[in-house]
């Protein structure tokens, strides 16, 4: 449901002037970098990031780790495998879902700092890419023969919902899968950014998630915003003092594209703590759109998530839990170039495991277009990130701790704690 956005900076009635449009005198065609935008501002909301670069420019050069950390991924894979094979644990999982949830204090215990070497190791982790196996074709063909229909099924409720466009759904999703590959960012773009690191991207996204939640925007707006940022950074070098400006302008663009009533320029200036002016944001908006050649048709994962949930008759709890798991993926730079349909499938698959529904049926293969073998590596990384939620995606964890999202993040945290205990006990 779309939400009406209210200004956070003032309560009076706005003038008829449309502040989402730049003044006529400033409509100058600009492309390329953001260097023409003034940077003479008293402070930056991401000052912790800026100060790191300003005080020690040598940090811009990322050292290569000797050994990549693999223990977390192995432990996460063991948890998934244990839960898939242990049929007797279903009752325990259901009990865990209804027990008292973890408190904020328990979840947000300080994470032990292993020093700069651990941060560098995380910076240098390779992107996760979708793999195709020989058995995938056979499984997909079987699912296609079972569930594909040349005519509409009168027993399918979607046929009677004009919004679902059931007669064109197959062609629509086939086209969307082409778009997700067309607008896929380069996973190595950070190598060409002399002043930025992947950790800076995580800090920016953490702030964007909070602003997005404050404005009560649609999930599609958040995912499109992240895609705009990543694609723009693939094309242009951005200085660290303009990085937050790129994030704010990208969220403004995404809100215009996805929302019925998007926040105003004044709202974004307020949320950036007046670090940037109205004209700065409008100039950045034009620069980014010109850099992307106004190509904003990236499909995003939410439509694919709803499509997959059709295999379970649009079951609400599974999809809500999957939304948390899906949103956690935006923080991981290893998944920058991952297809949104694959991310949706991985989040939904892991959600089913957490809720004790261990079967990835032919219906799930058909509606997701992915087999269980293709999803397992992705689900392992998602689970790994959720095991260290306060470190990896604290703002997202807090967001999904609320009743509005059925306390999804707390349910996942408690399930992980119980699953780890069972794995340790079995060893």
Curated annotation (Swiss-Prot):
One of its GO terms (cellular component) is microtubule organizing center. It holds the Pfam family Cyclin_N. SMART domains: CYCLIN, Cyclin_C. Disulfide bonds: none annotated. One of its GO terms (biological process) is cell division. Residues 89-105 have a biased composition (Basic and acidic residues). Residues 1-12 have a biased composition (Polar residues). Residues 1-29, 89-126 are annotated as: Disordered. InterPro entries: Cyclin, Cyclin-like_dom, Cyclin-like_sf, Cyclin_A/B-like, Cyclin_C-dom, Cyclin_N, Cyclins_cyclin-box. PROSITE patterns: CYCLINS. GO terms for molecular function: cyclin-dependent protein serine/threonine kinase regulator activity. Keywords: Cell cycle, Cell division, Cyclin, Mitosis. Gene3D superfamilies: Cyclin-like. Residues 106-126 have a biased composition (Acidic residues). The keyword Cell cycle applies. Essential for the control of the cell cycle at the G2/M (mitosis) transition. Interacts with the CDC2 protein kinase to form MPF. G2/M cyclins accumulate steadily during G2 and are abruptly destroyed at mitosis. Belongs to the cyclin family. Cyclin AB subfamily. Present with 892 molecules/cell in log phase SD medium. This is G2/mitotic-specific cyclin-3. The lineage of its organism: Eukaryota, Fungi, Dikarya, Ascomycota, Saccharomycotina. The gene is CLB3.
């Amino acid at each position: 449901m779309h939400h009406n956005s209210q200004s956070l900076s003032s309560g009076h009635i706005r003038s008829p002037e449309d502040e989402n449009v730049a003044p006529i005198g400033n409509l100058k065609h600009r492309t390329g970098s953001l260097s023409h935008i003034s940077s003479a501002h008293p402070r930056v909301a991401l000052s912790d990031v800026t100060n790191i670069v300003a005080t020690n420019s040598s940090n811009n050069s990322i050292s290569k780790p000797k050994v990549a950390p693999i223990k977390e991924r192995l432990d996460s894979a063991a948890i998934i495998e244990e839960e898939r094979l242990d049929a007797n644990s279903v009752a325990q999982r259901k009990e865990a879902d209804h027990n008292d949830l973890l408190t904020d204090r328990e979840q947000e215990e300080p994470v032990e700092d292993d020093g700069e070497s651990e941060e560098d190791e995380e910076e240098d982790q390779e992107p996760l890419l979708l793999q195709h196996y020989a058995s995938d074709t056979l499984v997909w063909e079987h699912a296609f023969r079972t569930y594909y229909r040349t005519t509409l099924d009168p027993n399918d409720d979607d046929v009677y919902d004009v919004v679902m466009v059931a007669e064109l759904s197959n062609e629509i999703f086939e086209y969307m899968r082409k778009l997700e590959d067309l607008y896929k960012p380069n996973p190595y773009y950070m190598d060409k950014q002399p002043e930025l690191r992947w950790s800076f991207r995580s800090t920016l996204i953490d702030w964007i998630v909070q602003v997005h939640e404050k404005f009560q925007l649609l999930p599609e707006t958040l995912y499109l915003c992240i895609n705009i940022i990543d694609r723009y950074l693939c094309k242009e070098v951005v200085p660290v003092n303009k990085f937050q400006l790129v994030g704010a302008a990208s969220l403004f663009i995404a809100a215009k594209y996805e929302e019925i009533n998007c926040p105003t320029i004044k709202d974004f200036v307020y949320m950036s703590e007046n670090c940037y002016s109205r004209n700065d944001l409008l100039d950045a908006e034009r620069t980014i759109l010109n850099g992307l050649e106004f190509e904003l048709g990236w499909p995003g994962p939410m439509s694919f998530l709803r499509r997959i949930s059709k295999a379970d008759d649009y079951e609400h709890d599974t999809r809500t839990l999957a939304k948390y798991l899906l949103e956690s993926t935006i923080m991981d730079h290893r998944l920058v170039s991952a297809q949104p349909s694959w991310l949706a499938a991985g989040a939904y698959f892991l959600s089913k495991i957490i809720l004790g529904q261990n079967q990835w049926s032919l219906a799930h293969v058909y509606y997701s277009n992915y087999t269980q073998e293709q999803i397992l590596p992705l689900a392992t990384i998602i689970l790994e990130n959720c095991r260290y939620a306060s470190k990896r995606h604290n703002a997202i964890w807090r967001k999904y701790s609320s009743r509005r999202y059925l306390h999804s993040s707390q349910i996942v945290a408690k399930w992980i704690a119980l699953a780890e205990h069972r794995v340790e006990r079995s060893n």
